[in-house]
Each structure stands twice: as C-alpha cells, then as structure tokens.
C-alpha cells in the first residue's frame, strides 16, 4: 500500500525502481495497512480528524435511562476496551449533558479493572465478518495510564459542578457558539466567573450545520488526528447529521431497558432504505457483550 500523502506517495518506490531495485507491492497486506491508515489518510487528504463514535447500549438500543443514568450498561471487559481505545486516540469528545450527568474523567485507568476483565482479552481474538486489524491491535494493546487524550467538551453547560473531573488540569478544551456562551453566562454567575484558563473556544457561527466544521477545525488546530466521540445522544446526533462520524464502535449488552435514551438523536429518515449502511463490518464477543464495528465509507475514499 502506497503512502496516502500525495506529496510522497510512490516516490520511494520510484527511486528504488530507478536504481534498478525490484519492488513488489504485497497486496495481501493491503487490508492490514488500510485498517491502520484510515485515520491518517483522512487527516492528510481532507485535513480533518478521524472520528470514532463509541457507544455502549442495551439490547433494545438505549445508552441510558430517561434519568440520564448509564452506569453500567456494559461489562468490565467492554469498559476496559474503551480505556484501551483512549490510549490510541488524541482526544475524547463529550457533550454538555454527559459532562453534567457522569462527571467523566476521560482518562486511562487500568487500575479500575479486575484481572478477570484483562483475562477476557487473553483468550484469543474471535472477530467475525471482515477481519479488522485495527481491532486486533486494540484487543492486544495494554491501556497506558501515562497517555492523556485531550478532553473536549462541546457546548456550554448550565453550570460547572464543584470538583469536576473534566477541569482537573489544563489538558482540555471547551467549544461552544457565541450565542450559547452569551446566553448561559447571562443567566449564571457560576459560568461568568469560572476560570477556563484560556481553553474556551467560542465560535461565531449561527448556523447549527456549521458547528461540526468549526469543531473539527479546532481539533485539527490542537493536533488531533484521531478522536473518540463518547456521547451522549445529542452530540452524537450533531456529528451524525453532519456526516462526520467515520467509524462506529457499538457495544451491545444483554440488558433490556424498555425505554430510555437512544445512542443517536439525529435527523429522522423517512424510509429505512435511507439509513446509513456501514462498510467493512466486524463483530466480536467481549465477555458477555457483543461489539459491532463498521465504517461510513470504504478505504478507497479520496480527497473531497
């Protein structure tokens, strides 16, 4: 597989050929290279981060109760996989409701998990459908607590809780619109007086459709190539409506809620035939849970 960067793609091969060196392109390794290079290719060709949407849901498709409670839907093993993924990305994105409901830390904490959770990944990797080498590497990886992805909060919350894990240090950014910012600080002195330590980015856009473009530009400016979108439903819907989710990693637990919050609150489709059909789909068992992973488009996408 040639380097997707058009500035260098194929030049090394050509130099070798010019020097009389035989070069063989190992096509059998294409799937492996494609799985590992998707994010890099998008970043190089389109200048935007690669967005991975991770959700844990019940069998009937709920990520939380109507109260907002979501602890815990998935098993220890599945949550450990999420910490492995946090070790692989540059940023973790949440919306204001998740920020208020969960007080998330968004860091890598292998010490939170039992030996049983770790041992579930030592029993071999059983991937069905398309064999995904990114997932294989993720399953084998050890979560590294020294890696701290950038914490990203989208939207201005109604208030900042005392002792918020999100604001424990300076490795974060808050992205909101000027309209939302002005409305919230006018109503709440807690927000007006809070020290965001120059890590608040306020966008001038009024059109909601431009929100995600602004967010992606901010992430790029922070050096983010891969970002995990951890939700909740509202921010997932915002990214989904904008066509900005590249990879879906959905964990399904054998629980039935009966009612609750869906993973994506996006614009409805009139017909099921209009629903997004994913490519290169892989499924895997993680303890008692099932992981389903797929991509918005195939690897052979080009510059937009």
Q: What annotation goes with each model-predicted range?
A:
Residues 26-56:
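Proteins enriched for Cys/Gly/acidic motifs involved in redox and nucleic-acid/cofactor modification
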Residues 1-34:
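Active-site loop-to-helix "anion-binding N-cap" substructures in soluble metabolic enzymes
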Residues 4-8, 25, 45, 70, ...:
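Short, well-structured alpha-helical patches and their helix-loop capping segments
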Residues 10-18, 30, 50-304:
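Enzymes that bind and transform nitrogen-containing heteroaromatic metabolites
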């Amino acid at each position: 597989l040639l380097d997707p960067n058009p500035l260098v793609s194929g030049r090394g091969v050509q130099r070798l050929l010019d020097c009389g060196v035989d070069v063989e392109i190992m096509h059998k390794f294409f799937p492996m290279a494609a799985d590992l290079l998707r994010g890099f290719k998008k970043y190089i060709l389109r200048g935007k981060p690669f967005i991975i949407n991770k959700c844990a849901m019940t069998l009937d498709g709920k990520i939380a109760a109507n109260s907002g409670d979501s602890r815990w839907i998935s098993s220890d093993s599945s949550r450990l996989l999420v910490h492995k993924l946090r070790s692989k990305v540059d940023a973790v994105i949440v919306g204001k409701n998740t920020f208020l409901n969960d007080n998330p830390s968004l860091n890598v904490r292998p010490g939170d998990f039992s030996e049983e959770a770790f041992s579930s990944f030592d029993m071999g990797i059983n991937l069905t459908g398309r064999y995904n080498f990114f997932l294989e590497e993720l399953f084998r990886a050890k979560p590294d607590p020294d890696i701290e992805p950038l914490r990203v909060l989208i939207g201005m919350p109604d208030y900042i809780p005392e002792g918020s894990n999100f604001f424990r240090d300076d490795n974060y950014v808050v992205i909101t619109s000027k309209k939302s910012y002005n409305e919230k600080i006018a109503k709440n002195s807690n927000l007006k007086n809070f020290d965001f330590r120059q890590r608040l980015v306020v966008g001038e856009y009024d059109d909601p459709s431009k929100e995600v473009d602004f967010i992606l530009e901010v992430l790029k400016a922070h050096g983010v190539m891969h970002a995990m979108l951890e939700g909740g439903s509202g921010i997932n819907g915002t990214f989904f409506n904008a066509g900005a989710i590249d990879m879906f990693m959905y964990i399904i637990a054998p629980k039935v809620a009966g009612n609750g919050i869906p993973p994506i609150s996006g614009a409805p489709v009139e017909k099921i035939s209009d629903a997004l059909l994913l490519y290169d789909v892989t499924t895997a068992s993680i303890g008692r849970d099932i992981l389903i992973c797929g991509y918005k488009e195939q690897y052979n996408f080009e510059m937009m």
